[in-house]
Swiss-Prot record:
Record family assignment: Belongs to the pseudouridine synthase TruB family. Type 1 subfamily.
Family matches, as NCBIfam families: TruB (TIGR00431)
Molecular function as annotated in GO: RNA binding; tRNA pseudouridine(55) synthase activity
Keywords: Isomerase, tRNA processing
Primary enzyme class: isomerase
Function: Responsible for synthesis of pseudouridine from uracil-55 in the psi GC loop of transfer RNAs.
EC number of this enzyme: 5.4.99.25
Gene: truB
Protein name per the record: tRNA pseudouridine synthase B
Reactions accelerated catalytically: uridine(55) in tRNA = pseudouridine(55) in tRNA
Superkingdom, natural source: Bacteria
Biological processes annotated in GO: mRNA pseudouridine synthesis; tRNA pseudouridine synthesis
Signal peptide: none
Keyword Ion transport applies: no
Amino acid sequence: MINGVLLLHKERGMTSHDCVFKVRKILHTKKVGHTGTLDPEVSGVLPICIGRATKIVEYLTDKSKTYDAEITIGFSTTTEDQTGEIVEEKKVQNPISEEEIDAALKQFQGTIEQIPPMFSAVKIGGKKLYEYAREGIEIERPSREISIHRIERTTPALFENGTVSFRFTVLCSKGTYVRTLAVDIGKKLGFPAHMSHLIRTGSGDFTLDECITLDELRDISEEGTVDEHLVPIERALNHLPKWEINDTLASKVENGAVLPMPDEFAHFAEEDRVAVFAPSGRCMAIYMKHPTKQNLMKPAKILSQDKQS
């Protein structure tokens, strides 16, 4: 069985679920899951878990994301990106200095509050926001805390036809809406704005350079070399602390045993996780602090081997 993380270069126009469906079809396996929705109009890095790796999906969705975005200042849209209808227009009469733009971007770095857009999959009252939006209903959305680790302009500001546009790169926490960020940058500069282009260039330490397209996946599937192009579970979890155990403990982990907590993890909070490695170098499980028993750790996820392995 195929196990590992496929780094897919998602094309524009496809949903994340479309990608999962196509990967299942190409690889003839049902055990496929993506690690977080990427809007249809956005291309770029979409890690897809296959086989045993589907058990670690939740640990990959939390990784920070890197985007290359373009903002157009001068009008805003219903969807906050280039696909929506214009809702507000205010022509830019004079060029905006790059110093002013850079100063505005700098104000967004750090932990900030963001209100999710109406055209998004965020659920309120058991219903997705885009479902309300399609009915022409706008509802109040609570703001959410996000982190902008880095944001900087990457191209000169282009002034033409009453608009100013430029590209920027942003490294941000999960759940950040870059189109909303573009709108807020415009507001900071005194104009309506929208995101006119977006590509995800990184997810955690996975980069666009490592990704393959669906067409390339078809080719390597026919060649029988899919395994060579997958990220092993062990590397996919390298953002977690590592606990290397001996053979005695390994047999206990295989059975989901509760284990004494090593001193190095004594500081763990309830939400912290550690990747447990067998002497062979295989990641066997993900452990967590026991919620009720002091100085003990329990399995959060057991990554069983396939029967044929």
